[in-house]
Amino acid sequence: APDYNGYYDLIPEGFDFCDRVGARLAMNIFWYQPGSRARNSKCPLYVSVCMRDTVAPAKKTLKYLSGTKNVEYKKYDCGHFDIYVGSDFEEAITDYQNFLYRTVPVK
């Protein structure tokens, strides 16, 4: 997926980073589909759908959400890791906070 190397932008400068994972991950990663369980959630969900995502494609994410109750989502014009940095992050974090303020009010 073209987005895969975007996670490098999340690593702090000067951080001693080991770019490896255990081989056992390869046997599970292709079947890991957290969105497939969204339908079973009993709590309110907020989902950020990155429309240019090549790691977790938006079309599949939207399909999972179509039958989910108590879900709110927003489409962002960015890739998978773009939403964690820069202006995409600023927009998304504001949306996350607003969702929390509405669904988990603090008195």
Task: For each feature predicted by the language model, list its residue ranges.
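Catalytic histidine-centered segment of alpha/beta-hydrolase-like enzymes
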Residues: 78-93
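Short, surface-exposed alpha-helical segments at coil->helix boundaries
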Residues: 58-62
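Glycine-/small-residue-rich active-site loops that bind phosphorylated ligands and cofactors
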Residues: 53-54, 81
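Short beta-strand/loop motif that positions the catalytic acidic residue
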Residues: 41, 47-49, 53
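Alpha/beta-hydrolase
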Residues: 1-37, 43
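C-terminal alpha-helix
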Residues: 95-106
